[in-house]
């Protein structure tokens, strides 16, 4: 009976949002998932790894970011997903586990949940629909576990440092380039009570380098810290690149979280971060039964702090 109710729920959901405007991509999430994860940094899943790279990307700029991609399926997410290890070449034990894995096996994975419309499907992505087995390591998706913090029995929190190898340092996007792009993203949000639809223009600019000025003392959550901050380009710490405050996400036990310890209002950090959809703001913007057109709410996952 429970399976029947779930099938009916997701069928009704598909019909309800069938007429949603398709721009670059439309994602439909269960309201429970949004409420459960909106103020969390991470998610834990049993990941069936279907496709993966066998070695890390080279390090340069843009997509040459030193990550390793894997695509798979997880009952906890029920969406096409890609998981990524930061500074993967340094995580030799995790790379060994990945390369020895078989598609039939599942690996316990914990990491930062991330929704971002960089690689959306042309079709609606409805949480709970059957997820097709991916045919490569970077299929159409908007859900990621990125960066991973635990891969099998291996902790990889030490990967949350500037991306580099012995000869090369990664060049992230300057704040003056990336943040105007984030701010320009448009979205349509619709809430029917049991599910929330987000339609967004296509996004990009994965890694940005910037200065943050904390607007308050960080708030502790179960798996990290959240804090509002002003955002500056490294070349100009006088004029913020965004007129409003934006939320920063720090993962407990990582070097960025350690660097945050003891800081408060007015303190600065030189960081690298990646954007994700801010589900707290999505929920606040959503009006039951109404369509809301707004900028795409986003926040920044802090993946590294640069030494001063």
Segments (PLM) and residue ranges:
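Intrinsic disorder/low-complexity segments enriched in polar/small residues
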Residues: 3, 22-24
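OB-fold and OB-like single-stranded nucleic-acid-recognition modules
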Residues: 25-308
């Amino acid at each position: 009976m429970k399976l029947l109710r779930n099938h009916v729920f997701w069928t009704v959901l598909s019909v309800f949002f069938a007429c949603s405007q398709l721009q670059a991509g439309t994602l439909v999430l269960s309201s429970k998932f949004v409420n459960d994860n909106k103020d969390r940094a991470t998610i834990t899943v049993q990941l069936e790894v279907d496709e993966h790279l066998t070695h890390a990307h080279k390090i340069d700029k843009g997509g040459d970011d030193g990550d390793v991609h894997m695509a798979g399926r997880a009952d906890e997410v029920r969406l096409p997903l890609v998981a990524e290890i930061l500074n993967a070449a340094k995580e030799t034990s995790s790379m060994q586990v990945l390369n020895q894995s078989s598609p039939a096996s599942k690996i316990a994975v914990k990491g930062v949940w991330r929704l971002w419309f960089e690689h959306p499907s042309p079709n609606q992505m409805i949480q709970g629909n059957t997820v097709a087995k991916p045919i490569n390591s970077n299929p159409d998706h908007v859900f990621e576990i990125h960066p991973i913090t635990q891969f099998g029995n291996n902790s990889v929190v030490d990967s949350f440092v500037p991306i580099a190898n012995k000869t090369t340092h990664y060049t992230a996007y300057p704040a003056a380039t990336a943040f105007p792009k984030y701010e320009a993203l448009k979205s349509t949000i619709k809430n029917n009570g049991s599910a929330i639809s987000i339609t967004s223009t296509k996004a990009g600019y994965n890694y940005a380098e910037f200065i943050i000025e904390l607007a308050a003392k960080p708030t502790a959550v179960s798996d990290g810290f959240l804090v509002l901050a002003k955002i500056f380009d490294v070349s100009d710490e006088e004029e913020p690149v965004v007129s409003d405050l934006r939320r920063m996400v720090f993962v407990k036990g990582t070097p960025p979280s350690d660097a945050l310890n003891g800081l408060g209002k007015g303190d600065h950090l030189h960081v690298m971060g990646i954007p994700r959809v801010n589900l707290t703001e999505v929920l606040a913007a959503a009006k039951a039964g109404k369509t809301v057109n707004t900028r795409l709410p986003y926040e920044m996952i802090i993946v590294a702090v640069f030494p001063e």
